Amino acid sequence: MADQRPLMTWLEANNYESFLQEDIFSFLDQSLFVDPHSSFIDPFKDFQTQNWFSLQDSIVNHISTTFAADHTFLASLDLEAISSTFSLDISSGWWNENNGNYNNQVEPNLDEISRTNTMGDPNMEQILHEDVNTMKEKTSQKRIIMKRRYREDGVINNMSREMMKQYFYMPITKAAKELNIGVTLLKKRCRELGIPRWPHRKLTSLNALIANLKDLLGNTKGRTPKSKLRNALELLEMEKKMIEEVPDLEFGDKTKRLRQACFKAKYKRRRLFSSSS
């Protein structure tokens, strides 16, 4: 025991009191006791002697007997299966090395998460359903608009001035509807063809004047010569044809006066009818 004193002094000098209190190395009291007359005084002198290996066996056997409980615990487990499949985590969970997941769980994708979050919530399901319907409606509307624009562009590009003449006697909105195009595109095509304004009002006014003169021509009793009325009718018919060819043409002075005279005649006729009744 006198040989163990330097060892105890060295351990105390290095502050190993906590380990000595636990008495973990108590098994070294017997295993390191060596006879001074034996060959262990110089172990490196005969490194492969029986005494050296017997000393190793005694230390290892003593350690194995001391920690027998640990070996028993490890032996009860299938180490090969654990190393190949699972490893124990610090937080008492299992990590699967094959699929790289914790506790052998399969992580859901984003679609499954979104469906799981919306399950049981009728408001969220209704909102998602409305959003999908809105997206479909917008997509269908865009397709309809693109098809209509493509068709309208084809119709407008093929439209000439001669084709538009037959639509001059109707309002521009009705003409666009008849042509199955938009009013804006029709106005644009008119400007491209040199028609700054739609001549519907001018032609309608001329048709009204012609109708009034025909009535006067049938009801005259010698106060107005019929020859003058016929000349006026010819003048209006000529001007109507000129406006069809040149829609931007303004009325002449004779046409303006004739229009004022017709207005006065209609006014007098109304006064007579109202007074007689």
Curated annotation (Swiss-Prot):
Coiled-coil parts of chain:
201-246
Enumerate the subcellular locations listed in this protein's record, separating them with semicolons: Nucleus
Q: What is its main location?
A: nucleus
Keyword vocabulary terms for this entry = Coiled coil, DNA-binding, Nucleus, Transcription, Transcription regulation
> Where would I find the RWP-RK domain in this sequence?
142-226
Please give the Gene Ontology molecular function terms for this protein. Answer: DNA binding; DNA-binding transcription factor activity
Under which name does UniProt file this protein?
Answer: Protein RKD3
**Which organism does this sequence originate in?**
Arabidopsis thaliana
